[in-house]
Amino acid sequence: MALTTAPAVAQDAPSDVIEDIVVTARRIEAPMWEVRRGDSVLILVGSIDGLPRKMEWRTDALISAVDRADRVLFPVEGRASLADVGRLIWRFRTLTRLPNGRTSADYLSPALEARVESLTGEGPTRDSMLILSGDLMELGGYSSGGRPVSGLVRQATRANRTPAEPVGIFRGDELIEKVLTTPPERYLDCIDAAATAAEAGVEAGAQRAENWRLRRIPEVLDSPLEKAATACSYWSVMAQADDLRRIWNTAVDKALAETGITVAIAPLRLLAEPNGVLDRLEAEGLEPIGPEWRPSAPAQSAR
């Protein structure tokens, strides 16, 4: 019988109940937009990674909205078998060390290598670019141990049996193969951005998190740490950012074709970037209701 309670909103709930859910969602201390098409209501929550572990924000409003939604969408996830995990453990050194006894100085420009060494206080490193980028981002305030927004929501959907699914699934063996075989040169933009974030310092990283909580979207996207998180993401390193955009645009269109309320936890940059999801929806005549996601136009000087 418990399975029948959560999905009932779309079919039986009066409009005032739906409006109450939307009002609850608007209290979320995170970037959130409401989009409607006919009988469909889509609540887009823009998430960022690396939030401080001890950061306080109103998770109760988000969980309440998720509890009463008809369905929830999560970011793309990878699903690995025990064999995949075993392979990763077996080749752990490949994941964490540069190949053939090389160091970072063999791949980075002299100027970038000097910046990295100044930040880490060490000479050329044999750590892989994946490990080095993570170390630099932590110097910029990125918290790898923090709980992601999607993880918080996923727990809520399991507790209340709200229908939920990722917008896409990666096979574990394909994911691991790409990570293990990607040449270090593919990480150069990532290392440059991560070094810039580290140079900005943990205070700038903390301000990014605060701007996210206060829904200051342009400031979040312009922060060095957010740019580094984007440049060092799987999708950027593997040159598959366009694939991610396609996946999310398809998922959003599908959600807006279904009756009821859908809550989607999506990458903030993908939503708010120029020609991103929000721009596309607006161009199609829909009205994303929420914080302004575009930078303010420069003020015209008086003549």
Language model features: what each stretch is:
Residues 234-303:
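A cross-kingdom marker for long, charged
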Residues 1-3:
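Sec-dependent N-terminal signal peptides
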Residues 5-7:
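N-terminal signal peptide c-region/cleavage motif recognized by signal peptidases
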Residues 15-236:
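Structured, acidic catalytic/metal-binding patches in enzyme active sites
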